Amino acid sequence: RKISRRSFLSAAAVCGAAAALTACGGSSSSTAASSTASSAAASSAAADGQKYTVGICQLVEHAALDAATQGFEDALTAQFGENVTFDFQNAQNDSATCATIANGFVSAGVDLIMANATPALQAAQAATNSIPILGTSVTEYGVALGLTDFDGTVGGNVSGTSDLAPLDQQADMITEWLPEATKVGLLYCSAEANSQYQVDVVKAALEKK
């Protein structure tokens, strides 16, 4: 009996969550719980010898993104050993290259695409509606994918983890530390959807105070 593709994808999703926790400095207890769950989902893979290929599109070399990718690879390798192989591609901070990479993964027929950062996720979603996609280092999926009435679940073939910070608490911290402040400067990149989203949320929170 071979492990089902669904079981592999379930284990990969849990490994992705564990990797995101590691990259963001998450608790060891949460990571341990994720590891236990992924072990249960993947226990029969090594014995049955089913082979899987994961395409990884990472936007750019960056310490946090590198850690998320490495943690994801390490976690899946720990569960599946030689039964999983990775095709890692770095887009060199270019959205067009992300699209080229994603289309290449689709042509190659990979079993799963791990999209590391928002442009990588956007490119992967545009490239396929059938190959499962796991996003990481993505702040807000609704904004990144242009979803209306986003309720926290993307649906379809896209899932993943979010690195969204507690923006309301950050606004509270500003007013607590600087109660007399009347003007607050917010640095962000207007070309990046998640950056725009965060500054809008913080601005709205500060205007209420």
Task: Indicate where each model-derived feature is located.
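N-terminal secretory signal peptides
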Residues: 1-3, 7-23
